[in-house]
Amino acid sequence: MNSQQLFDDLQQRGLIAQSTPLEALVERFATPQVLYCGFDPTAGSLHIGHLVPLLMLKRFQNAGHQAIALIGGATGMIGDPSFKANERVLNSAQTVQQWVSDLSQQITQLMTSQGENCASLMAVNNADWIGKINLIDFFRDVGKHFSVNAMINRESVKQRLARPDQGISFTEFSYSLLQSYDFAHLNREFGCALQIGGNDQWGNIVSGIDLTRRLNGVEVCGLTLPLITKSDGTKFGKTESGAVWLESSKTSPYRFYQFWLNSDDADVYRFLAYYTFLSTAEIEEIRQADALRAGKPQAQQILAEHVTRFVHGEEGLAAAQRITQALFSGDVSYLSLSELAQLELDGLPCVAASRTDSLLDLLLSSGLASSKRQAREWLENGAIRVNGERVQQEGGLSGFALFDRYYVLQRGKKQFALIKLEGLAE
């Protein structure tokens, strides 16, 4: 894919919100270049809100360019105020350092999981250079290039200042200087020519372009990605239970897969463009095939498979699909211990119990019945299954527990709960 094809593809996918002149970008990227995107450590894992910039780095990688993932070990100690309603809570240095390590490992694994050469990705920590800066030198050499008038006129800052109950601290106000310095440093050390980021980062990116020109005498470029919203206008990326994480110990591959599988018909083709490497022609073929198909579209399954494979690999995808099929068929007997652990994490309502607990009580505590009377009716009508076997007795749990610890309760075809026996060694 040549440079013109790369940027045409990005535009067709709707992945460019703002940029420096595209003609200059196309010309610049006609030869191999270096680009970067920053990720501040605000938790021990990235979430799906980080996927579009990660995949953008990957798209440039696949076109023969070198990607830098910058982990903000320094900037993460401050927090970006851009379009935030309140001052960020400051985390301890030890916490931030651990998160930096976690994110660096996670990003490296994601960006090299498809078999590419590790040399095409560089993960760096801006604490390695910002931590060595002398304060007076920074004010003299960097601070003098920033106009306070221009900084307070940024929309992201004006919104905070306009709120009578909120101001902005000097700590957060200085964030833009540090991010700008990152760009200048990466340009000087690695020849970095492009910074990408979310649409809320445009002001910081432009400041970095200006500072790089002043410090290094070099013209560099910037590009932002759109804010991803659903068809109803709401921000995409969270569920009722919170963020959807990329780390399997925080969001299981099964729950991750289900999240994409439940994409709305009005969103799914756009999401295929944003979150997969399928060509726009292939996506249009899927759309047309779905329009002719009687029944459920295939686009959601294709989306879920591609994104889950990218984040969790073939093994994670296979596990998510096995769990999905097991719950659909009602036969959970072939699930592995690790797959049942996924259901315990976030796949099903989970209730701790002992073997002597009444099934009536468990149906109540799990939410499968609203009263003992209703629970008895479900049992008498043969609507309750335990580990796939129909049960009509009210007594305690009996029979074979999966891996001596789990029972899957099922009411009807679609209502499930997981029972975990207490007091077992993990």
Curated annotation (Swiss-Prot):
Reading the lineage from the top rank, the first entry is Bacteria
Position of sequence motif 'KMSKS' region: 235-239
According to its UniProt record, which reaction does this protein catalyse? tRNA(Tyr) + L-tyrosine + ATP = L-tyrosyl-tRNA(Tyr) + AMP + diphosphate + H(+)
Q: What is its EC number?
A: 6.1.1.1
Residues that coordinate or bind ATP: K238
* Major subcellular location class: cytoplasm
- The record places the motif ('HIGH' region) at 41-50
Residue ranges occupied by any S4 RNA-binding domain in the UniProt entry: 357-421
Q: Where in the cell is it found?
A: Cytoplasm
A GO molecular function for this record?
A: ATP binding
Tell me which GO cellular component terms the UniProt record holds: cytosol
| A Pfam family assignment | SYY_C-terminal
Which leading EC class covers this enzyme?
ligase
Subunit structure as annotated in this protein's UniProt entry? Homodimer.
- Hey, which family's this protein in? Belongs to the class-I aminoacyl-tRNA synthetase family. TyrS type 1 subfamily.
State the HAMAP family in the record: Tyr_tRNA_synth_type1 (MF_02006)
Summarize the protein's role.
Catalyzes the attachment of tyrosine to tRNA(Tyr) in a two-step reaction: tyrosine is first activated by ATP to form Tyr-AMP and then transferred to the acceptor end of tRNA(Tyr).
The protein in question is named Tyrosine--tRNA ligase 1
Q: Which gene encodes it?
A: tyrS1
